[in-house]
Structures are given as C-alpha cells and as structure tokens.
Amino acid sequence: MKYLFYTWKLGCLLLLILAGCSSKKSVSSYHSFESECLGVELDGSETLRAWGRGKNRTDAIEQAKKNAVRDVLFKGVVAGSRECSVRPLITEVNAQERYASYFNDFFRDGGEYLKYVSMEDKKTNSNMKTSNKTQISYSTTVRVLRSQLQQKLIEDKILKP
C-alpha cells in the first residue's frame, strides 16, 4: 500500500514537472503590411489600402503613398480584390537597382510620385493605426493613377512602348 502511494505521488510530481517545462504560449497579433486592392476605376487607376510607418501620422501616411506606388511599379498588388493588376508595371529584373538614381529622385520627399497618387477615395475615419515604442503605422486609402504612371515611364524610357 505504501509502495502504491509513493508511486502515485512520484507520478504526479513528474507530471507537474513536465507540464511546467512546456513552452509559454504568447499572444501576439500579426498584421500584414502589404498593399491591398480595393477596386479599379474606369480610367485604369487602382484604389489601394496601403500601409506606412513613420515617427508621426504625417510621415506614416506619406510612406504609405510611396509604398502604394512602389507596389504598383515593382510588385503588383496581390492582396484584396482581384480587380487590380497582379502584374507590376515594371517586369524587368532588378529595375529598381538598375535605375536607382531615377527612382531615388522619383520617390524623394515631395517627389514626382505624388503626381500619380490621389486621396480622392479616402473616407473619414478610414485610417487604421498600430504603433510600437518607436514608430507608428497607418493604413490609408490611396488611388494610384496606373495608366498615367505607365505613360510617364514610357516617356522617361524606363518602359518600352
């Protein structure tokens, strides 16, 4: 009887030790920060929800505009509605590096990319915000003028007609 009691006690102790050694389950949220298609207009422009990060709200929204144009140019828009073109405007491999001086100037603060971004479709309170200790992330609704952007790249001899 004593032997059975000690065996049972040892089994419970072993079970508690093993349960305490399990990895801790952390609760965290993951949010994809890639541009998402919301629709396409009849003029060929694409309405996107784009994310940007910055020190404050203004910086984050400007970065979101740059990210939207960059996604249309180099990555294509895969997430969201299937109306947007999955194919990027520039399909040439390493085009961003090859034409680095052109795109550095194009995407500088206050640069030419702003001519191809419109905030027409932005609705009141449509921004989403996440933050950590050092940066704020905002999403905003942006319309990228894809056909005008394509024409500009053809004129600048980045794309072939």
Segments the model singles out, each with a brief description of its role:
Residues 21-161:
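Domain-level marker for long, solvent-exposed, non-transmembrane regions
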Residues 1-21:
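Sec-dependent bacterial lipoprotein signal peptides
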